[in-house]
Amino acid sequence: MIVNIKRDKILDELLKVSRIISQKTLIPSLLGILIEVKKDKITFTTSDGDTSIKSEIMGNDLNITRIGSVLIKNKFIVEVIRKIEDEFITLEVVEGNLIKIKANNFDSVLNTLNSADYPHLSFETEGKEIIFTSTVLKEIISQTSFAIGEKEKRIVFNGLNIKTDQNNKELIITATDSFRLSCKKIDYSNNYNFDVIIPGKFINEIGRLISENDQVSELLLIIINCKQKIIEGKYPDTSKVIRTSFNTSLTINNRAIIKIIERRSVLSNETMTTIVTLKIKEQKVLVTSFTQEIGNTEEEIRDFKVEGTDQIIAFNSKYILDALKAFKTKEITIKMIDERKPLIITANDDQTLQQLVLPIRSY
């Protein structure tokens, strides 16, 4: 195997695929990156046993002299290439089990792993497919993934639910950890029906991997055919918890309410839970906060529109901030029933997104 390749390009791909490598794996070969040089491209494959990633480089960024493959620990090759400053480098397998990395006035030889021990990972699929642009996929992930549970006893809450609604020609994306819920809807014109739960870890990794210029295709196609990637189980019908009638609605500049709540939380840390209370009384709106270690703070909201009855509702500041930041609109509307029922956040300028946050009993 001999290939001459742009240093920046290979380093970028190595860093992308190496993110999922787990140092806790019991399979030694999974500590490595499988590099395969073919007739017109070079591929990089990694896996943690559950999630697998394959990336390719082709075109003018490389010149292939001899095809072949090599398995090498990711840390070694990444650190060596990171130190090289030349525009191009050459990778060459020598003596069967060594890889030589060459550049101007630089030569390094590294030990390799046995590539024959690497598990066979098939990325070929024959199932249903759905195509997202990277822009849409990144928006879906940023607006929903924060609500995915991490170590929930109900394992289905540890993933992102994606299902079709053929009646409304929509794709419904839902995440919840049982304390908050995020629901995103996008237009969907295919006749394929599916209802899958994708692990949160995989969703977040996809979000980090894709770039704005990529066309992300066949995401569900790949996952559906790799059964271990799917969380088995039936996702609950969350439409039943999203109410359509409310007693009070508060419309406000989104950035303004975010800043107010952030000021209420500025002295807290990850070990503290800041309880933020929204008080609506006689066309006056106050935001107060309380932490056991610090005490109380209060701020009055100036510009807003409120309709309905007075309310006093307390909630976790992190949960409400995550929900508000998911919206890219100028204004949002917070809809409330009472201090015990979930509040719903929507936006007139984005009918595709709803956020739900459960209140906290502050007494």
From Swiss-Prot:
UniProt keywords, alphabetically: Cytoplasm, DNA replication, DNA-binding, DNA-directed DNA polymerase, Nucleotidyltransferase, Transferase
InterPro entries: DNA_clamp_sf, DNA_polIII_beta, DNA_polIII_beta_C, DNA_polIII_beta_N
GO MF annotations in UniProt: 3'-5' exonuclease activity; DNA binding; DNA-directed DNA polymerase activity
UniProt KW S-adenosyl-L-methionine keyword: no
Localization (cell): Cytoplasm
One Gene Ontology biological process: DNA strand elongation involved in DNA replication
CC terms in the record's Gene Ontology section: cytoplasm; DNA polymerase III complex
Coiled-coil zones: none
SUPFAM superfamilies, per database record: DNA clamp
Top-level taxonomic group: Bacteria
SMART domains, alphabetized: POL3Bc (SM00480)
Entry similarity comment: Belongs to the beta sliding clamp family.
PANTHER family, A to Z: BETA SLIDING CLAMP, DNA POLYMERASE III SUBUNIT BETA
Stated role: Confers DNA tethering and processivity to DNA polymerases and other proteins. Acts as a clamp, forming a ring around DNA (a reaction catalyzed by the clamp-loading complex) which diffuses in an ATP-independent manner freely and bidirectionally along dsDNA. Initially characterized for its ability to contact the catalytic subunit of DNA polymerase III (Pol III), a complex, multichain enzyme responsible for most of the replicative synthesis in bacteria; Pol III exhibits 3'-5' exonuclease proofreading activity.
Complexes and interactors: Forms a ring-shaped head-to-tail homodimer around DNA which binds and tethers DNA polymerases and other proteins to the DNA. The DNA replisome complex has a single clamp-loading complex (3 tau and 1 each of delta, delta', psi and chi subunits) which binds 3 Pol III cores (1 core on the leading strand and 2 on the lagging strand) each with a beta sliding clamp dimer. Additional proteins in the replisome are other copies of gamma, psi and chi, Ssb, DNA helicase and RNA primase.
Protein name: Beta sliding clamp
Taxonomic source organism: Spiroplasma citri
